[in-house]
Regions:
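Nucleic-acid endonuclease domains
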Residues: 1-80, 87-156
């Protein structure tokens, strides 16, 4: 089962603020995104990412990590005894794409959220074993990739 969430204007303002701070700090520190796609804007990627995190936190009534300091990956959430890494794309039919480097600091679950401001849909999740046995290339270098139809449904 999929779940759709529409962010309100305060949540969108929070997302824009955190995305701006994360993008600026990364630029100052000289760090880059794990997946570089020609022509993509780092701020837009950060904005979609934090929106996905807000959607997940709002859905599960858990605290959102509001930090904007430089992070080297790792999970976005802990839900029960499972670590969760949220991946967000604006493509409605998008796939769960996980950079190769995530294998060094794996999360227990990888969640795919699709959408664009203000409405997003939680599509499902894959386990770390499923993710790390799904190496492929979506046209921008090697990564782990799982199609939506192969994701597990959440119970809401």
């Amino acid at each position: 089962m999929q779940h759709t969430v529409t962010l309100d204007e305060n949540e969108i303002m929070l997302a824009r603020t955190i995305a701006s701070l994360r993008t600026g700090n990364n630029r100052v520190a000289g760090t880059s995104h794990n997946v570089q796609i020609p022509g993509q804007d780092n701020f837009r990627n950060d904005l979609l990412g934090i929106c996905g995190e807000i959607v997940f936190a709002k859905t599960y009534n858990i605290y959102l990590d509001l930090c904007f300091h430089i992070r080297s990956g790792g999970p976005d959430f802990k839900l029960g005894n499972k670590t969760i890494d949220v991946k967000t794309t604006h493509h409605a039919n998008g796939r769960l794409i996980v950079p190769l480097a995530k294998k060094n600091k794996p999360s227990d679950r990888y969640v795919l959220i699709t959408g664009d401001l203000p409405t997003f849909t939680i599509r499902g999740f894959a386990t770390s074993d499923e993710v790390f046995s799904s190496q492929g290339d979506v046209g921008h270098g090697s990564c782990f990739v799982i199609n939506q139809e192969n994701l597990h449904a959440f119970k809401f």
